[in-house]
Amino acid sequence: MKEIILCKYGEIALKGLNKSTFESMMVKTIKRRLRSAGEFKVTRSQSTLYVEPLGEDVDVDEYMERLSKVFGIVKLCRCGALEKDIRVICEKAPEYAAEALENARTFKVNAKRSDKAFPYKSPEICSELGGAILDKFPHLKVDVHDPDVTVTVEVREDHAFVHTDPIDGAGGIPVGSSGRAMLLLSGGIDSPVAGYMMARRGAVVEAIHFEAPPYTSDRARMKVESLAKLMTPWCGDIKFFCVPFTEIQLLLKKNCPEELFTILMRRLMMEIAQRVCDKEGDIQALITGESLGQVASQTMYAMVCTDAACRMPVFRPCVGMDKSEIVDIARKIGTFETSILPYEDCCTVFTPKHPKTRPSVEEVEKAQNSFDFEPYIQKAVEDTTVTLIKNR
């Protein structure tokens, strides 16, 4: 029996005249994510994408795992594709669902008939197939309210598809449908989650990291590169920019008020990130993992001072989330265990003892203008390295 994966989408179906554009983006993403999994074919019809693995010894579970990380898909169904004949459905559907049914006590049948030319209506399909299942598995009982197994038959244009265990997709909209943004990627828990959340809303995510050797180690940089790699199954390939930041941090420590160190550092990071974006081209925004009030540098006053140095919009998708909520997402996307590895990053090595939580833009700008950072900013941008981190 031929197996096909049905990829169902949610809000894309509501995009009106732009729907086909979103579908095309999702097809491109699927082809990139599955390129190393083997041969396959992708078609689309009736607000569903059909992924058909080709060849022998195909690992359909591997296809399902990769597709579960494609934004835009809300449900994935591993299906047996049957001839649209009620006798074939009643014969083959119980066989396809046998593994699930053998270990169950109760079941129900759910039928969806989008092909209205099919001679049996949905209740009739349920009745016929339910009877066939009871004949083959007499230990089962019907429970339409809380069954152990639901056998679903979808009668569509070309085939009848049978499945038992749909899984949730990643949701959101396809990567690439909402522009391109630069993520300030530290070694912590929050910034990978912020990148994931923006990718889920269609942004192509690139990443920029600031390192401060010898105060930060090669292992710290490798940790951040590993985080970027862990993001690629969700976000796709990521350009990873690494900025040498030691000299600027030492100058800040020497020439600026200690209580404003972190805010001034973040302002200079934003300025460098924007210039790297200008140099790269076609990047519309910055992303940070800041959460309102989580630490002293993430008060509303501090964010206002940071944003005053920005020409580009700054997205903070974690801004209204508790730490526990951010951790839950980090665990889900597979970045948490790497994020908590105990390597210093440049944001922590020079942390002031008593950071100011209610700075004003005027005093921060005055402190920054007390020293000419411009030549050092230019040098940091020139010395920035870039690596393409690929998904698989």
Give the residues covered by each predicted segment.
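RNA-binding accessory domains that recognize and position tRNA/RNA substrates
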Residues: 1-182, 192-239, 247, 279, ...
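Active-site adenylate/phosphate-handling loop in enzymes that bind or generate adenylated species
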Residues: 128-133, 166, 170-178, 245, ...
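Structural beta-sheet core signal
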Residues: 183, 207-209, 242, 288, ...
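Conserved G/P- and acidic residue-centered "switch" motifs that form tight phosphate/ATP-binding loops
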Residues: 188
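Small/polar glycine-rich anion-binding or flexible loop at a beta-alpha turn
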Residues: 292-294, 342-350
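A short alpha-helix-loop-beta-strand transition element characteristic
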Residues: 334-342
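Mobile late-domain/C-terminal helix-loop "cap" segments
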Residues: 342-344, 364-367
